[in-house]
Regions:
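Phosphate- and other anionic-substrate recognition elements at nucleic-acid/protein interfaces
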Residues: 1-174
Length: 174
């Protein structure tokens, strides 16, 4: 299947560090445009963190003009307060994308790992090394949160950007 040229933004939501990765698809080949992290750990309260997430995701969308966005779904943990905060962070990132009328797909962490490495239980380091190979990167990003964002974008490309039972499409909630 030939995929038309497009830019995909991948997001890995977090409450202390949020990772992102941006890839360009040209003639069905992937190229990394940018990757990085949004540092949130120095901000005093959760509301300021949410504000920064919204602003930075909005900036990334305005700067790189992605055609589609992929976001990692929160994993299920035992600490309810942490899960609520993570859900808010993801929701704010999604709201920033949706205000720009972009389609967004959500992928479970296991689905992303499976798409990148062939193993849904792969470590972050294994995912990073496979991304290095797939994207022909000379060196890995310094933060694994950045590679997680990049992995979401690559997973979305591998899935063809089409909804299936493993992901949710938030572009058409009418």
């Amino acid at each position: 299947m030939i995929v038309s040229d497009k830019i995909i933004l991948g997001l890995d939501p977090g409450t202390t560090t949020m990772g992102y990765g941006i890839i360009r698809i040209r003639k069905n080949k992937m190229e990394m445009i940018s990757t990085g992290v949004i540092h949130l750990h120095k901000l005093e309260n959760h509301e300021l963190k949410l504000k920064k997430i919204f602003e930075k995701v909005s900036f990334l969308v305005d700067e790189y003009l992605p055609d589609e966005v992929a976001i990692e779904a929160p994993f299920f943990g035992k600490n309810v307060q942490s899960m609520l905060k993570l859900g808010r962070a993801q929701g704010v990132a999604m709201a920033a994308v949706l205000t720009k009328d972009l389609p967004i797909q959500e992928y479970a962490p296991r689905k992303i790992k499976q798409a990148i490495t062939g193993n849904g239980n792969a470590s972050k380091e294994q995912v990073a090394k496979m991304l290095q190979s797939l994207l022909k990167l000379k060196e890995l990003p310094k933060k694994l949160d950045a590679t997680d964002g990049l992995a979401a974008a690559v997973c979305h490309f591998f899935q063809g950007g089409k909804p299936d039972s493993g992901k949710k499409n938030y572009s058409d909630w009418d």
